[in-house]
Structures are given as structure tokens and as C-alpha cells.
Amino acid sequence: MTTSQRLDLIASVADFFEPYTGHFDRESLQRAWDTEVSAPSVQIPNYLVHILSGNTPHAAYQSLLNGLILGAKNRIKLPSHALLDFQLPPIMADFMEISRHLPEDWLSEADALVVFGSDQTLRHFRERCPLETPFIGHGHRYGIAWIQDPSAEAAQLAARDIGLFDQNGCLSLQTIYLEQPRAFGPLLAKALEAFEAEHPRAKLDRSSSGAISTLREEMRFLAANDPENYELWESQGSTAWTIIFQNSHHPTLSPGNRTVYLRPTPSDFSALQNLSGIALHPYEPRFDLPSPRIFPLGEAQFPPALWAHDGVLPLASLVSHQTISPKINASSGKS
């Protein structure tokens, strides 16, 4: 199958992928190919191994789309007890192998390896990956928002970014920065309550629910003893959503499941690390912020197809290049 035929085939099943990858068409597939991997020196991987986490299916389909464009044989390691409804168009079957365990030969035969998971998972597979094999790791990251117009509309957009997928995955907002963060609390509480009514959060196991309850108790204690620096808003009778005002710029990893921090805007965002993206409201393109993705508030979970996940080009990162040097004739010396 030629590259053109393969891109035609992928474009024919775009409707299947687009809920997870964002919109693409035949033209955008060709443009990505021409931009990233059309050079004669490019060597396409024969076997591309994807080690997937169970947070959301989006990263899985986005990674697979990259491999399909390249024409690699995609070996997909699914989580043992997650992504149970993961499926693919039958016409793409020749490009894929799927397993919930990791066959021994997959790593040794991999021409490129893509891993999603914890930082510990990334270290584990990086140590097992030969140095010459392209390795792309997507580990712990989180999203933030910078809201300069704290309106009811902004609260609704933020609730969408917090609530979709229950903060599973690296794109979800965990911290919102504002000039007056405490004043935004009631607006966001109303918006999250409305979002919960329309999109109920998934049922939690005892451990996850307990983590939220423990954090709430800690925040109640702090708010009672230091009300200038702490305040808590919470869903009544459940752990459906939790909002914490903390008078500190430094982000804290939340337990997820619609738990978010409101913090004062720092004078410099450069100290923040491991960001997946920054949502802005109002939106304007900003190239001075320390994040691989800048986007309008409300669109955290919907990056464009073939985006540079974690700042890494999706196709170019998976290929290698071979340099063929011309023969240099030694010039004869003069007597």
C-alpha cells in the first residue's frame, strides 16, 4: 500500500477517530506527512509499540493515529483492567496487534516506543529500551487556567474543563489562577453544581472518595484557623466536586474527580513545572508562557488532531534519519 492510499484509508474512517483525536481530513494528513516525515533520509519504524494507561481513551487513539499515518505495524499494550471497550475499525486490522499483556518480543523488536503512565512507569520502560530506539514518554502533567475576566461565563467554561472525564488524564485543570481567587469561588461552585446535574461524576471506589473526604477535613481545619488564607466550597451530601481557595502560588496535586484549587496569580509562571497546558480567559495567543499548549478556557480536553503532545512533534519524534555521505575524492597534490 502506498502512502497516498494509506492516508486515503485513514481519512475514510475519520468519523471514528475524531471524538478522540479532534477533526482531521485527507488534506491535514498529507500536510503532516509532508511537514514531518517526507525527507529522503527518514526511516519509518516497522514496529511501533504503544504502552497505554487507563485514564482516558483519547491518548490511545491519538497515539495510534500517528502510527497509522506512518504505516508502522502498531503493537498496542492495553491496560489490564481499563479501556475495556477499546476497539478499532476493521479495515485498519492489518496495521495493528492488540494485547493486555506485554509479549516479550514486542520491546526487543520495537523500532519506536511510546509510553503513557506514571513517571515510574516511564523510567521502567526507558531502562528496557535500547538507546538507539526512539522513546516518547508521556508522564505526569496537569493543566492550569489563568482567568483575567472572572465572569459567570468563565466559571461555566472552567467547570467544563474540570468536569469532563472527572479530571482523569493530564489535560484536566487542577489549578485556576486569578487576581481575586476567593471571589471566584461562589461562581465556580454554582457552575460545577450545574455541570454535575447534567453530567454526574462517575462512582468512586472507597479509596478515591476517602482521599477527597480527607482533603476536605484538612481544608476545613485550615479555614477555621486561618480564614484569610483558606476557604472551602463543596458539594452537599457527596464528594461530587470540591473547590479550595489557598493563598499560595505554588500548585498542589489534587486528588482529582473534580477537585480544583483557586490561587492568586503569580508574577511569573516560569516556576511552574510539568504543565500540559494553560487555559486563558479572555484568550489571546501567548508565546511567553511555560507550557507546550496554550488554549481558550473550555477547550482543555479537545486539542487539535496531530498536536505536539508535551511539545513533541507527533510523527517526527517516531522516525530516525539515515545520513548518506557522498564520496570525497582526495585531491592530488602538486609536485
Describe the residue ranges of each PLM region.
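Short His-Asn-centered micro-motif
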Residues: 51-54, 77-80, 115-118, 138-139, ...
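Short, well-ordered alpha-helical microsegments
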Residues: 60, 121-123, 185, 286
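Conserved small-residue-rich beta-alpha loop and adjacent elements
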Residues: 32-95
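NAD(P)-dependent aldehyde/semialdehyde dehydrogenase
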Residues: 165-178, 182-328
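Donor nucleotide-activated moiety binding/catalytic core segment of transferases
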Residues: 32-55, 99-107, 239-256
